[in-house]
């Protein structure tokens, strides 16, 4: 299942893929679905994978919670580097958490649940990092570089 605002992640031929798109309120319809609502709806479905195409808001908290409950999940996010991607997702999740979690707790949740961070620029893979655990002293994710262009 892929929840996204724009068609960044697509396939026209895979029979087992479900795509949910956000819908803005317009003059023609008062119906509105944002990525947060789509993420909540997605988590109630019996899906094998939960993917958010371009995290940029409160849906980040649902992505982290889904992963932390054992749901296989992935996301795209715009960031400056592979190491900056989890930080960016945490920035968005902090907006949604209402101070329920702090930055270190959310980063540790990511470190516990995700294994790989890939940085893509201009349709080229620039960097691949393995998440190698959590450093309690520095309160940060430990990485192992697997590939760098």
Each PLM stretch: what is its role?
Residues 1-111:
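Switch/coupling sub-region of P-loop NTPases
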Residues 111-149:
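Conserved P-loop NTPase
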């Amino acid at each position: 299942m892929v929840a996204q605002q724009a068609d960044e992640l697509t396939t026209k031929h895979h029979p087992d893929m479900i795509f949910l798109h956000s819908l803005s309120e317009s003059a023609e319809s008062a119906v509105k679905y944002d990525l947060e609502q789509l993420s909540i709806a997605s988590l109630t479905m019996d899906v094998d994978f939960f993917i958010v195409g371009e995290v940029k808001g409160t849906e980040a908290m649902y992505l982290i919670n889904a992963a932390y409950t054992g749901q296989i999940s992935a996301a795209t996010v715009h960031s400056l580097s592979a190491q900056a991607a989890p930080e960016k997702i945490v920035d968005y999740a902090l907006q949604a958490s209402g101070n329920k979690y702090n930055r270190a707790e959310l980063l540790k949740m990511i470190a516990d649940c995700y294994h790989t961070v890939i940085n893509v620029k201009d349709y080229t893979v620039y960097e691949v990092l393995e998440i190698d655990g959590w450093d309690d002293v520095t309160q940060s994710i430990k990485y192992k570089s697997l590939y760098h262009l």
